[in-house]
């Protein structure tokens, strides 16, 4: 899988930009705030229908325009894909894949798979559990449409249950019983799929992490949930929801479920979030990203596109070497402010260089 070309109109600081990409390594060089990350953002948006930088689609539209247009042409082993996206300031958007209208975001996912690594991804390890849940949900939605459906349903029912808790009376108590049954059904599936994904990360990630650290470190991922028996997760979750209802009524929110879960990353049996050095935390994120690449490859038979947003400068020479020696079979799009530090690894590879300056791109 690789992107042949990208066409952007009124996207961020680009007026009308058409770009041919190499199926191998593409390097975008320029100072900060020139538009390098905007290119990656457009590709990421074409993959999952969301930006990695903002929750407001209107932020993607050039400030003096009413809409933006993105076209991404993707070469696949079986069938090429042309993804067209129109985003309007009134909040509406229109998406087609090979000229067929997309009604649900789940229909967009899987046409273009990407894995993105940016400096902000350190939050997956360092920050609150929501970042780790978001990581799992995005990666699972890329490869499992059922997961996406059940996640949407779970969040919808969760919101309705929380509203019912705030307006509780004896009649609503029966409604909450129904919500609990539905939450248990969808929540159990989410919990089990997340745990399975972490099992895959453990198998693949351990080998990757050992390569990066020259066998000095062992990494482990462990799902943290109130559910003890995954085989009977639905039944157990229903029991726990009923048990915690009094507390939920006092707090006007649902205290148990996959929306509260987390996962632990440990290196040599030590919690990386609390006790890991900055270097260890970066390596853990690197392991997560490259393990995710392999999981997608194992499931769909093709590597996704790898997006590296100004992260190589954040890595020491050993980690840089690992990254650049691991991308031979993967279309990789790199942004950086200078290539001096990585040029020694790239000179033997098929790579294309682009200079970015104030929304203008020059192929070198």
Curated annotation (Swiss-Prot):
| Source organism per UniProt | Clostridium botulinum (strain Langeland / NCTC 10281 / Type F)
CDD domains reported for this sequence: ABC_RecF
Quote the PANTHER family the UniProt record gives: DNA REPLICATION AND REPAIR PROTEIN RECF (PTHR32182:SF0)
Q: What does this protein do?
A: The RecF protein is involved in DNA metabolism; it is required for DNA replication and normal SOS inducibility. RecF binds preferentially to single-stranded, linear DNA. It also seems to bind ATP.
**What is a GO molecular function of this protein?**
ATP binding
Keywords in alphabetical order = ATP-binding, Cytoplasm, DNA damage, DNA repair, DNA replication, DNA-binding, Nucleotide-binding, SOS response
Alphabetical list of PROSITE patterns matching this protein: RECF_2
Which Gene3D superfamilies does this chain map to? P-loop containing nucleotide triphosphate hydrolases, RecF/RecN/SMC, N-terminal domain
Q: What does the similarity note say?
A: Belongs to the RecF family.
Q: Does the keyword ATP-binding apply?
A: yes
Among InterPro entries, the record links this protein to:
DNA-binding_RecF, DNA-binding_RecF_CS, P-loop_NTPase, RecF/RecN/SMC_N, RecF_2
NCBIfam families cross-referenced by the UniProt entry = recf
Q: Name one GO biological process term.
A: double-strand break repair
Where ATP binds, per the record, is at: 30-37
Top-rank taxon: Bacteria
Instruction: Fetch the Pfam families from UniProt.
Output: SMC_N
Q: What is this protein called?
A: DNA replication and repair protein RecF
A GO-annotated cellular component: cytoplasm
The cellular location(s) given in this protein's UniProt record come to: Cytoplasm
Which stretches are annotated as coiled coil?
A: none
Presence of the UniProt keyword RNA-binding in the record: no
